[in-house]
Amino acid sequence: MAHKKGTGSTRNGRDSQSKRLGVKRYGGQVVRAGNILVRQRGTKFHPGNNVGRGSDDTLFALIDGVVKFEYKTRSRQKISVYPVPQEEPATVAG
């Protein structure tokens, strides 16, 4: 009977931490400038209007507005942020 564990036991037994990737803000949501829209590896989603791309391919909003998912081509999706039309304050006629 062996009194030592097999060599495989010391090489296994670890796992990497999850990177919490994915879509963080969905279509129709109101975002502030600087909000992260998507964390990704590679460019599954491409930056559209008013969206910046970080060095790790993270997409983020450049302005305050509403998120919209669009297709660049049949196979390429882009994410844009469009400004919300501001309502003017109602004036009281008097």
Swiss-Prot record:
Gene3D superfamilies: 2.40.50.100
GO MF annotations in UniProt: structural constituent of ribosome
Keyword Chloroplast: no
Database matches in SUPFAM superfamilies: Ribosomal L27 protein-like
Entry superkingdom: Bacteria
GO BP of this protein: translation
Family recorded in the similarity comment: Belongs to the bacterial ribosomal protein bL27 family.
PANTHER family: LARGE RIBOSOMAL SUBUNIT PROTEIN BL27M (PTHR15893:SF0), RIBOSOMAL PROTEIN L27 (PTHR15893)
Classification via HAMAP family: Ribosomal_bL27
Protein name stated in the entry: Large ribosomal subunit protein bL27
